Amino acid sequence: MKRVLHIGKFYPPAPGGMERVVETVCLASEGLVESRVLAMHTSHETVEDTRDGIHVTRIGTIGSAGSVAVAPGFPGALRRAQADLIVLHEPNPWALLSYAIVHPRPPLAIWYHSDVVRPALQYALFYAPIAKPAYRRAERYIVSSPALAEHAAALAPYRDRVRVIPFGIDASSWRGIDGPSPFVLFAGRHVAYKGVDVLLRALRGTSIRAVIVGDGPKRGEWEALAATLGLGPQVRFTGDAPDVELRALMQSCAVLALPSVTRAEAFGYVQLEAMASSKPIVSTDVPSGVSWVNRHESTGLIVPAGDAGALRAALERLMGDPSLRRAFGEAGRRRVEEEFTLARLRERLAQLYRELGLLAEAAPC
């Protein structure tokens, strides 16, 4: 069986959308290829472990440069890795730098999770030089939606090598319930593009309760904003939540809010978790795959990015109409079962592996 090495930032139980996607892809590939993971550790220690049958090497970090975790041992680990295919999950500056240093021999595919949203000069001076060695060599570029395939400027020179493989979820393990006290849920990293400040301003002057899950550099600022807006006990910041707690919150919430303000939100994996739980979504019209996942007036509502008034109106509409929430939630569940199952993900991965010569044409999915 051929071996595929996935290079991520971190790996579960570390939280994050990319982390969940890498894990899901590895699990969906079981029996097709042997999946291994090279990622960074949240501490200074380098460890190897096995999670759900997947061998994971976590390289210790010594701090960060800006928002980039620094793992000095990463290039050496990449040089020593044995694989028939490397899948580099992007954006991932330290992994790109390591790739540029090592120039590993196995074929390469880039899983393009989202655009790098930076000022043009900053991108040209700092990001593009370390990205070029990998991008020029990659045999395939994988994106999660047709919208991202169309709009990703970094992939424009390589359109013939782009493949759309939407993310998948095990819908059988997600079931929604009607909680005794309806609330809006946000779950994600506390970084600027997530737009939690817009959500907080949307909640001002309403009686809507919200639970905000996650952590990151903006958390302190957003907690202070909630206090300034007088939201008090109306809004609860939980910090990072274990999987079991996040699942319980998702399954008992009334609405998922995804108030992202830039195309750095390329898909919004948390939307799949909401739809699998039969929960409606309020998302924004960022030019990415977010609005391809959540269908306006079908599985939820879509509002202009950065517009607190429109977000407030959408949340009030759904929170005030249990029947509409139920209808949107049921439509979301159907959409997951039709488009975003692990079986569909596995079929698409098998086709990719066949194209790259890792799987025989007759091999079953």
Residue ranges of model-derived segments:
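Conserved donor-binding/catalytic core segment of Leloir-type glycosyltransferases
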Residues: L5, R175-S207, V211
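N-terminal strand-loop element at the rim of the active site
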Residues: G8-P15, V21-G66
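Donor nucleotide-sugar binding/catalytic pocket of nucleotide-sugar-dependent glycosyltransferases
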Residues: T57, A131-W174, T238
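An aromatic- and histidine-rich active-site surface loop
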Residues: G73, L85-R105, I110-Y112
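Acidic donor-binding loop of glycosyltransferase active sites
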Residues: E139, Q251-A266, K279
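Nucleotide-activated donor-binding/catalytic signature segment of Leloir-type glycosyltransferases, i.e.
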Residues: E223-A241
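Short hydrophobic beta-strand element within catalytic cores of glycosyltransferases
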Residues: P280-T284, N294
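Conserved acidic donor-binding segment of nucleotide-sugar-dependent glycosyltransferases
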Residues: R295-E297, L301-G309, E316-S323
